[in-house]
């Protein structure tokens, strides 16, 4: 199962509308086919990562019943977050 928190939606709402649409499509694909190669769904250090188009990523953490997605943003921001 995949979950989001309030913080995720704050980041999501700051995205351009076209990226929000890509994020929505990526989420639907993640629910039905997490192994789809376009998602690049993988564990990176302590986080789970999924691709949202070419220049955006989302990060989550593993929780009891699945993954809690807490962040979405640019690949540059993603690189900074995963390096911490």
Protein language model features and the residues they cover:
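Short, charge- and proline-biased low-complexity linear segments
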Residues: 21-30, 76-84
């Amino acid at each position: 199962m995949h979950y989001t928190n309030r913080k995720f939606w704050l980041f999501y709402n700051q995205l351009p509308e076209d990226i929000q649409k890509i994020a929505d499509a990526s989420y639907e694909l993640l629910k039905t086919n997490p192994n789809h190669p376009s998602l690049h769904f993988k564990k990176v250090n302590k986080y789970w990562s999924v691709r949202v188009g070419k220049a955006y990523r989302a990060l989550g953490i593993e929780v009891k019943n699945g993954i809690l997605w807490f962040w979405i943003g640019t690949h540059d921001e993603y690189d900074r977050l995963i390096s911490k």
